[in-house]
């Protein structure tokens, strides 16, 4: 995908993953196979962004293969599982499982259950934590549990969801009311994608 007001530049795998997920969702809502065809076409591009460096995973950018990011791999897992649900093709389920396992192994912070941003090809971890990255792993775990019945995926999702609640929500007290927790101020899109995962769970 490209910004429509700019000339062609670098192609980012994560941006195309979001488009693929959208096409899957439109297909689910309409049953129109042209949207499924678009989703499967985009998936071929995503697959071109994988290799055996660091044991697997999807790169962030086609022209700058310096890191493999949670923002490519977590929604990439969701994307694969949505394609599996739409087609019944076991290859998509296998890819979803593999991407999930790779992301968990390389980018999960075992201390709190949230996910780091990226891993460089030198093995260095980009330690920033964003709501959408962890939220997509919640959704991925929930979808894998639905597809397989394996409760380990459900437990993973529940742990990361609880960690999201601890990290990305804060207390709010309305005038004259009782205190409760709401999503912290920040990037609204990141928060919205996190909520997708919480809703799936």
Positions of PLM-derived features:
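Glycan-recognition and catalytic cores of secretory/periplasmic carbohydrate-active enzymes
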Residues: 1-201
């Amino acid at each position: 995908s490209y910004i429509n007001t700019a000339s062609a530049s670098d192609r980012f795998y994560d941006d195309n993953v979001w488009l693929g997920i959208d096409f899957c969702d439109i297909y689910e809502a309409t049953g129109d196979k042209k949207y499924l065809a678009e989703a499967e076409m985009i998936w071929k591009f995503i697959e071109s962004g994988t290799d055996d460096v660091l044991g697997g995973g999807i790169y962030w950018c086609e022209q700058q293969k310096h890191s493999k990011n949670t923002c490519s791999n977590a929604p990439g897992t969701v994307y694969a599982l949505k394609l599996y649900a739409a087609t019944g093709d076991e290859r998509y389920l296998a890819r979803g499982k593999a991407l999930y396992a790779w992301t968990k192994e390389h980018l999960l912070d075992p201390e709190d259950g949230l996910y780091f941003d990226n891993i460089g090809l030198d093995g260095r971890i980009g330690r920033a934590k964003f709501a959408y990255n962890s939220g997509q792993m919640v959704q991925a775990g929930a979808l894998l549990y639905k597809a397989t019945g394996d409760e380990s995926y459900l437990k993973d999702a529940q742990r990361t969801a609880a960690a999201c609640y601890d990290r990305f929500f804060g207390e709010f007290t309305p005038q004259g009311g009782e205190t409760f927790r709401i999503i912290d101020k920040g990037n609204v899109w990141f928060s919205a994608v996190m909520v997708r995962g919480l809703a799936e769970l």
